[in-house]
């Protein structure tokens, strides 16, 4: 037992003195200290309630704006449905049944506002917790409500614009391959900007320059999850369908949203650990005192 402890202590000192190991470990430890898994679950549940009103709003707005170009409307809409890989096929099969009238726009606006406001509130709580902003220094009413509204607007506009750019990039029309690549790259860059703005709005006392890496990692991770995570979860949904039936789709979508939320919070923790200098962290100390330097750190 003493030999195992000595080996663990040696590895602990090694990871603290090497950033390639020490920094990722500090991020994971900070994630656990903050209870970020629970925070991600709240965000995912709120997002679940916002998905379908947001989809209705997207379909209605695109139907109004692109009513004279059915081909472009169809291409953009299908590219937007890729954002829902678990239920994308079902949505594509039944998308024409959605109401594209003024009533659909009103219902979509109300449902989207209520649902995404829950996501915005949960995101504010999560990021302020992770950045260790005391509650007395967090914005109260009505400023927190105004921030939530701004987050909703940024996310909504960002979704529509990136869906449009992805539609151009994924098309096979008259535009050349260079323009399609440029459209996809621009959509990714816009996602980075959107996440930067959302993170800044959701956090009370953090500078713009401290958020760029987390925003970039979030955009990159979201694209990776859209490509690989959706496939894996769709595979699990097929296995769950025999037991849960139709509810397997709901469980699959919930799992995918949770993965997205968890990935986002991990990306935020990268910024927190980097900016707040929350590493190196000891593997054995719960007080945040590093074995390698003897310097004290805060709880996180």
PLM feature segments, named:
Residues 1-300:
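Membrane-embedded alpha-helices and immediately adjacent juxtamembrane helical segments
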């Amino acid at each position: 037992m003493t030999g195992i402890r000595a080996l663990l202590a040696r590895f602990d000192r090694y990871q603290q003195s090497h950033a390639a190991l020490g920094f990722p470990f500090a991020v994971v430890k900070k994630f656990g200290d903050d209870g970020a898994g629970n925070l991600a679950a709240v965000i995912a549940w709120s997002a679940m309630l916002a998905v379908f009103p947001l989809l209705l709003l997207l379909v209605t707005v695109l139907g109004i704006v692109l009513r004279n170009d059915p081909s472009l409307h169809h291409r953009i809409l299908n590219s937007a449905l890729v954002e829902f890989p678990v239920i994308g096929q079902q949505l594509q099969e039944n998308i024409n049944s959605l109401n594209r009238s003024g009533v659909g726009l009103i219902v979509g606006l109300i449902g989207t506002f209520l649902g995404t406001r829950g996501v915005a509130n949960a995101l504010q709580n999560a990021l302020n917790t992770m950045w260790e902003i005391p509650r007395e220094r967090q914005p109260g009413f009505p400023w927190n409500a105004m921030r939530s509204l701004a987050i909703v607007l940024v996310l909504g506009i960002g979704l529509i614009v990136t869906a449009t750019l992805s539609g151009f990039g994924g098309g096979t029309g008259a535009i050349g391959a260079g323009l399609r690549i440029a459209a996809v790259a621009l959509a990714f860059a816009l996602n980075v900007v959107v996440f930067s703005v959302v993170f800044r709005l959701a956090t009370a006392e953090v500078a713009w320059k401290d958020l760029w890496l987390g925003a970039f990692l979030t955009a990159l991770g979201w694209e990776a999850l859209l490509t690989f995570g959706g496939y894996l979860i769709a595979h699990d949904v097929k296995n769950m369908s025999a037991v849960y039936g139709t509810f397997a789709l709901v469980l699959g979508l919930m799992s995918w949203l949770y993965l997205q939320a968890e990935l986002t919070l991990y990306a935020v923790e990268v910024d927190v650990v980097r900016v707040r200098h929350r590493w190196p962290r000891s593997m054995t100390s719960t007080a945040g005192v590093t074995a390698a330097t003897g310097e004290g750190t805060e709880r996180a």
